[in-house]
Amino acid sequence: MSRRGLLASARALVLILALVASAPRVAAAAEGQITFALNITLAPTWFDPAETPGVITPFLTLYALHDGLVKPMPGNAWAPSLAESWTMSKDGLVYEFVLRRGVRFHNGDVLTAEDVKFSFERYRGGGAASFKARVAAVEIVDAQRIRFRLKQPWPDFMTFYASPATSAAWIVPKKYVERVGDDGFKKAPIGAGPYRFVSFTPGIELVVEAFDGYWRTPPSVKRLVFKSVPDDSTRLVMLKRGETDIAAGFRGPNAEDVRRTPGLTLRVTLPTVSQWVVFTEQWDPKSPWADRRVRLAANLAIDRKAFSDAEFLGHGRPASSIIPRDFEFYWTPPEYPYDPGRARQLLAEAGYPKGFDAGELATDVTFAPESEAVINGLRGVGIRARLRPLERASFYKADQDKQFKNLVRVGSGAAGNAATRIEAFVISGGIRSYGGYPEIDALFRDQAVEMDRKRREALLHRIQQLMYERAMFAPIVEQAVLTGVGPRVAETPTITGHPFISPYEDLRLKAR
């Protein structure tokens, strides 16, 4: 072949290789199934982003069915998702989001700024009051751009809007929701997430299938089945028999059994999940809990380290605050020692030398071990309480409606910072707050508009100091999440601070 021919052939080969390299990759068709055995019972309210009550649990299903403008992902706490970018004006009053083009919901509807505005305006979960108080207007610039105009600078707008502190930025299809209504949407949710809804059998299972049109990457696993199996021992047996691939929420001996079983893997994560006891009657002058000495006695009656070591195999962290220590603006309080002798002395000083009947301690049944540890500690110093376990969705509803008396075991893994946790659980009128104190409320209002970081941090630290000084709560533990993974699963993706295995589109099965 001539030199000219060789050069022509070489150029042709380079062109072909360039075309191949630039051509869109066709993802392999999704196949196989992964079954989850959950330690909770799923509720339809968690299929709708509008109703997330300041806790992390609903994101278990939201990450499958839906998508947000911005959300935590592996290696990025604020990953651009349905929004490919956003900007803030110099005066801090306007946030503008540019939507990703070509995104479709599971029913084929194209996602536009109208859906974003609609989703925000129907949002009624945790943080909704803050949005209503601080957002002046939501403006549709065009189909791909939406603008949030604030009444005054709000340093936490993105923390509230773009993290799992709330789910206000998770988008639903406006036309579909208007057609089927809120109840119809819960029965047959349509989202823009990596998996589409197939079926839900209350108390039994949720089934979802891969959505090939997902913008980020089509899932590799075709079907996910989330089974509700609240009993720890049953989940362990299922995992050992291969009846489930991933079993969540193990504790103590069962977690140790998973760790020692060949072929199984014990996955340990440290999410921002803290647990504590609420003294709902501390604002009632007729209640023993109105006396700070009684609340402090309850704190000294709990052996946090012994519980954490036993239940979480040493991975949990005893807590002295309801705010996780990894949160921005966290103030480090002194640790509560385990001191039952001092607790009895405080009770005697408060007029209860023989203790008192404290009524019920309400709890999500999933966290009965924590609640039993608290009750045993309280009984040891003369505070007699009875356990009242409820299924999780019922517990959340009753707690949000402030229906409980006496004591409540509360927990939250919602992301955010110290301000988002305080907004939901501490200030007067918080979505899950049973009362508040004027001094704390005033400090919270001040910090919400303080743009100087150091001054804002000082305000939030002062709030936390007052919470500690008044013994408003009895913190228990920052829990570890111990998950059993079976031999068929190749990859279990992790999002920092997130208790669940996600994003689901990154799950992989081992090659057969």
Kindly give the residue locations of the regions a language model identified.
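Surface-exposed binding/hinge segments that line
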Residues: 98, 130-176
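A structural "hinge/loop" feature
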Residues: 41-59, 82-83, 109, 157-167, ...
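Detector for C-terminal structural segments
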Residues: 31-38, 201, 270, 274-275, ...
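Gly/Pro-rich hinge or "lid" segments in bacterial periplasmic/extracellular proteins
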Residues: 63, 73-77, 164-219, 223, ...
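N-terminal lobe/hinge region of extracytoplasmic solute-binding protein
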Residues: 37-90, 121, 190-191
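Structural transition elements
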Residues: 195, 285, 292, 313, ...
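Ligand-site clamp/hinge motif
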Residues: 100, 122, 183, 211-257, ...
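Aromatic- and charge-enriched surface segment that lines or borders ligand/interaction sites
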Residues: 84-127, 141, 147-149, 235-238, ...
